[in-house]
Every structure is written in C-alpha cells, then in structure tokens.
Amino acid sequence: MHQIRAIEGDQLLQIALRAAGVDHGRISSWAMEPLTHRVENLTTASLDHVHGVLDDGSTWSVIAKTLQPASASPMFASIPVEHHAQVLEDLRWLNEPDVYRSELGPELPAPLRMPAVHHIEDSGSDRITIWMEDVGDVTPWDEDRYWRTAEALGALGGRWSGGDPRRRFGLRPRDIARLYFGKITHLDLPLQAADEFWDTPEIAAVVDSEHRRDLLQLASDIPRLLAWLDVVPRGLCHGDATPDNFREPAVGDVVALDWSYAH
C-alpha cells in the first residue's frame, strides 16, 4: 500500500532532475508502483518505485522508502505489551534518515558507499520518506562478490577503530549482547534446534551437512566473543549486512542499503 504523502510538484521535479543528472527540464510523465520486495520490519511503511520521463526524453528512476514508528505497524499488536518499550528502543525509526543526514556517507572507505539521497521528506509527524537512488544490481552473488563485500565491510570496521565514530557521526549505540541474549537466544536458536527447520526443502537445498554443526558451534562461542568485545576498541559497522541490503551496479561498486542499524 502506498504510504507516500502528497509531494509538491516542484519538489518532485527537483528529485527527478537529480536522479536524471541534469540541471533543467520538466516532467512529461511519471508513475509509481510498490516494489515487489517483501517488507518484514516494523519501521518500513512502504517501498515504492517512482519513475518517469523529462521533456527532453531523459528518464529517471528513484526509490521512495517511507518510514514509520514501530508502533504504527500492524505487527506491533502481536508483541506482548511488556516488551513494547524495549522494541521501540531497539527499532528507532529515525535512525536511517539521521544516518543519511550525517557526514558518514562522504567518509566511507572505498569501494563502499551509500545510495545517493535526493530528498528526505519530513512533515514532522509520524512518516518520513527517503527519496533515494534506484541502484541496479548486475553481479551475481558468487564467491568473488562475497569477498568484495566482506573486504568493504572490514574496511568500514577499521576506518575509525581508534576513536568513537558513533559520537563523530551522531550514531546511537546499540547493545549487540542484548540482541544475542534476546531475539537470537529466545527465538532463532530454538527454531534452528529442531530437525524440521533443517528439513525444510528450501533450506536443505542450499546448506551442506556441516552447516548446522558450524552454526551451533558459533552460537556457543558468541558469549565468549561478546565478553572479548567489551575490552577492545570499537569501530563502526553497518549492523544489517545481509545480501539483500547490498547492490553492485558495477563490479566493485559496493552499495549498502538500510543503515538503520549502523553503530
């Protein structure tokens, strides 16, 4: 369902011009369709593909991501009331626009970058729409791409390891120990302890016989690793580095999306 509120024609034109990479023009036509991407988090109200044609024939295309407080999601009602405050603290819906407004983007180590943000529409109420670059994805997730992405994320982690990047860029701290001893311990690990989970055809088709063993071994090591993290310098991480949050419009151009968990 579209969540984009009315936008002034002049503002849409400015977005279109930035997306097309031109200074002047008029919009001849435009359209908007919901992305087929499934939204599974509480703070994303909608994802829309907005595109059109300028009067000189130039085409433009952007993604409009509309954010909301977690409490505005229909899924919030399924969370026990006693956990509401904690969920709202963990899922801060203003994090992502704050990151895009910060100076982090220009200082990311190459080849990592954010999508270009053309406009952030903030009416001061309970919806914010980020109008951003429609980033293509042309390379397969083969071993080379996993290496490139991992190296880019490693460079990010080491870029500011001697200071406090969270303070520098206005990022809010995130307690990863609480994430592990919360959702992972009480939901993910019990789910993956069942044979039925691993027998699911979609899962069985993509993991080998050692994957389950390795994952459970890693889970048992995490408390020790978390204790070690408490005494070493902290860098900066993306916080949600799943393949779905990365695009490669060209080989080696690593674009990270969804910076709401950066810390």
List each model region and its residues.
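Conserved NTP-binding catalytic cores of kinases and kinase-like/nucleotidyltransferase enzymes
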Residues: 1-125, 249-254
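Short, hydrophobic/amphipathic alpha-helical packing segments
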Residues: 97-101, 150-157
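Active-site acidic catalytic loop and adjacent metal/ATP-binding pocket
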Residues: 46-57, 63, 223-263
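Residues immediately flanking
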Residues: 66, 134, 259
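ATP-dependent phospho-/nucleotidyl transfer catalytic cores
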Residues: 134-147, 155, 162-238
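Short, solvent-exposed loop/turn segments at secondary-structure junctions
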Residues: 69, 122-124, 136-138, 242, ...
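A conserved loop-to-beta-strand element in the N-lobe of protein kinase catalytic cores
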Residues: 125-132
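Short alpha-helix boundary/capping segments
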Residues: 88, 92, 141-148, 263
